[in-house]
Amino acid sequence: MSLLEEAQIKLANIAADNGWNKHEKVLIVSARDLTPDEAIGKPERDDYPLLNGKEVMMESRFRDGVGQAFTDQPGRFEGTLDDVLHISLDTNFRRAVFVSTLNAVMRSLKQTEATIHCKDKEPAFCAQTLPQYIREHHGQPKIAFIGFQPAMIQALNDAGFDLRVTDANPDNIGQIRCGTHIYDASLNADHAHWADIVLSTGSVLVNNTYRELQQGKPVIYYGVTVAGLAQMFSLPRICFYGR
């Protein structure tokens, strides 16, 4: 059973425990309807994947909770909570539907925070916070960095960390970005084995590649995508300026 399948069962139990009507509507809007300005505002850098269309932000609303999740498969979904609890988790789009809904539900229950992406100058502030956080909690580790989060990569590189970065975007692979070489995501497992710690986008949980990071090293997830899953499964997570 995958982590998301287990989460689906747990979410069904949460719904039952709260006596929710299984026919209650969940509205999900893909980031095609969230402009880059709505999703991330006007950050100081222009190389975020949200700004160049390589990733999109899916947003789910349940009652007063709003949850977001990155995906590379945008689309629309409108259905009931029961539909989400029984959705087949066989594509990145459907997994993103489930994860963003989980985030919205957990936020509605006030069981998690930072389920909405930071905006404007906040991504830069987040990145500036990261090196000190790593030093305080892990010293000066070798870091496998999964996903292209340019401000974070730049901050860690400038701070002198031994860093190996992987990405799935062919436009980045083999290039020097943010002062460091960008490797193919097919090397995730090798880099996780090499590193002392892994810093990973929560998108690996949506695209179902998280298992390759399990190399006996601490895995710390960053960002909004993993908000609900981190709370549900006690996964280490950082999201300094999420809303």
Residue ranges, per PLM feature:
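Short, hydrophobic beta-strand segments that form beta-sheet elements in well-ordered domains
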Residues: 143-147, 162-167, 199-200, 218-223
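Short, acidic/turn-prone active-site loops that include or flank metal/cofactor-
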Residues: 167-171, 186-188, 223-228, 243
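Electropositive, gly/pro-rich neighborhoods at or near active sites that engage anionic ligands
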Residues: 1-150
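Short acidic low-complexity segments
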Residues: 182-192
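Histidine/lysine/aspartate-rich catalytic loop segments that bind and position anionic ligands
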Residues: 148-182
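A short SAM/SAH-binding and catalytic strip from SAM-dependent methyltransferases
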Residues: 201-205
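C-terminal functional extensions of proteins
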Residues: 208-243
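An anion/phosphate-binding loop that grips the pyrophosphate of nucleotide cofactors and donors
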Residues: 195
